[in-house]
C-alpha cells in the first residue's frame, strides 16, 4: 500500500502542472502556497470591482431609482485615481523606510482606504436614494457622502493592486515574473466570479438592511484578505534602508516616465490600450440594467452576469497565455480581442429582440473573452517594451491607462443611456448604447495592427 501511495504521489507531481495554469510561476524561493497567499489581495480587489461595477450599479438604478447618469459618474469616481497608478508604483520603488520595507506601507494604507469607503457606502447610498427614513434628507448630503465613499474605495483599490503586483514581481525570479503577473490577474478574475455568485445569492431578496450587511461584510473581508496576503511576505532589509538613506538620490518620476515613453512604440501602445478599453468599458454600466429593464431579470440573476463576464475573461486570459508563450505577437492577440468584441455586442443587442436570457448571457461571456485576449495582449506588449529596471513602472502605466479609459467608458455609457432615453422608449434606450461599444472596438482594431507593424 505504501508503494502504491508513493507511485500515486509521483504521478500527480509529474502530471499536475499541466492542468494548473501558471503553475510554472512557482519556484524554490516562492513556492505556490506562498504565491497563492500573496494573491489574496487580488481577491479583495475583484470583490470591490464586482460591488462597484456590478451589484451596486444595478441596485442604484433599478431598486434605489437613482438616475443612470449619476450612477455612471459615481461608479467612475474611483477611477479618478487611475492616472496616479504609475506614480504610486514609482513611489513604492523608491520608498525609504527604517525597516527596509518598500511595498508593505503602501498596501496597508490602501487597505485602510478601501475599508473606510465600504464602511460608509451603504448608508450614503440610502441617503442618495431618498427612500424610507432618508426621504427628507438634503440631496447634496447623499451625493457628497456617496462620492466620498466611492473615492475612498477607488484610491484603496488602485494603491493595493499596483503595489501588490510590484511586490509579487519583487519576490519572483526575473524569468518567472510574467507568469506571476498572469497568475495575479487570474486570481483577480476568480475573486470576481466567486464574489458575484455570493452577492447574487445574498441579494436574492433585496432590502436596505441586507445591502448594509453585504457592503460592510465586504469591508471586513477586504481587511482579512489583505492582512493574510501581507503577513511575513516582504522581508525587513535594514541594509537596503541604509543604502537608500546614504546613497545617490533616485531619479525623479518625470525622468523615469520620460525614459519609458521614449521606448519604441510606447506612446502608440498606450493609445491602443486606451481605445480598446474604452470600447469594452462603455458597456459595463449598461449590462445589468439592460438585463433588469429589458429582460426582466432579478437582482440575483443580473449580479451573476459579472461572473459570466469574469468567466469569459478568465478563458480569454488562459488562452492568450498559452498562445503567447509560443511566441505569438501580443499586439496581434490584442487586435483579435477587439474583433471578438464586435459580434459580442451585436449578440447582446439582438437578445432584446428575442427576449432571450441565454443569448444575452452568451453575448456577455463572449465580450468577456474578447476583453481577456485584449488585456493580456496589451499587458504582455507593455512588459516587453519596458526597460529591465522599469517593469514596475510599465505595469503602473498599463493599469493607469486601462483604468482611466474604463472609467471614461463607464461614465459615457451612463450619460449616453440617459440621453437616448429622452427620445426613445425604455427598451431602445437600453439597447442602443451597445452600438457605441462596437464602433469603438472597430476603431481599435486598426490600432493594434499599425502598432504591431510600426
UniProtKB/Swiss-Prot annotation:
<feature type="transmembrane region" description="Helical">
    <location>
        <begin position="180"/>
        <end position="200"/>
    </location>
</feature>
<feature type="transmembrane region" description="Helical">
    <location>
        <begin position="70"/>
        <end position="90"/>
    </location>
</feature>
<keyword id="KW-0812">Transmembrane</keyword>
<dbReference type="InterPro" id="IPR004896">
    <property type="entry name" value="PucC-rel"/>
</dbReference>
<keyword id="KW-1003">Cell membrane</keyword>
<feature type="transmembrane region" description="Helical">
    <location>
        <begin position="35"/>
        <end position="55"/>
    </location>
</feature>
<comment type="function">
    <text>PucC is required for high-level transcription of the puc operon.</text>
</comment>
<comment type="similarity">
    <text>Belongs to the PucC family.</text>
</comment>
<feature type="transmembrane region" description="Helical">
    <location>
        <begin position="391"/>
        <end position="411"/>
    </location>
</feature>
<feature type="transmembrane region" description="Helical">
    <location>
        <begin position="270"/>
        <end position="290"/>
    </location>
</feature>
<dbReference type="GO" id="GO:0005886">
    <property type="term" value="C:plasma membrane"/>
</dbReference>
<feature type="transmembrane region" description="Helical">
    <location>
        <begin position="359"/>
        <end position="379"/>
    </location>
</feature>
<dbReference type="GO" id="GO:0030076">
    <property type="term" value="C:light-harvesting complex"/>
</dbReference>
<feature type="transmembrane region" description="Helical">
    <location>
        <begin position="299"/>
        <end position="319"/>
    </location>
</feature>
<keyword id="KW-1133">Transmembrane helix</keyword>
<keyword id="KW-0472">Membrane</keyword>
<dbReference type="InterPro" id="IPR036259">
    <property type="entry name" value="MFS_trans_sf"/>
</dbReference>
<keyword id="KW-0042">Antenna complex</keyword>
<feature type="transmembrane region" description="Helical">
    <location>
        <begin position="330"/>
        <end position="350"/>
    </location>
</feature>
<feature type="transmembrane region" description="Helical">
    <location>
        <begin position="211"/>
        <end position="231"/>
    </location>
</feature>
<feature type="transmembrane region" description="Helical">
    <location>
        <begin position="140"/>
        <end position="160"/>
    </location>
</feature>
<feature type="transmembrane region" description="Helical">
    <location>
        <begin position="110"/>
        <end position="130"/>
    </location>
</feature>
<dbReference type="InterPro" id="IPR026036">
    <property type="entry name" value="PucC"/>
</dbReference>
<protein>
    <recommendedName>
        <fullName>Protein PucC</fullName>
    </recommendedName>
</protein>
<dbReference type="Pfam" id="PF03209">
    <property type="entry name" value="PUCC"/>
</dbReference>
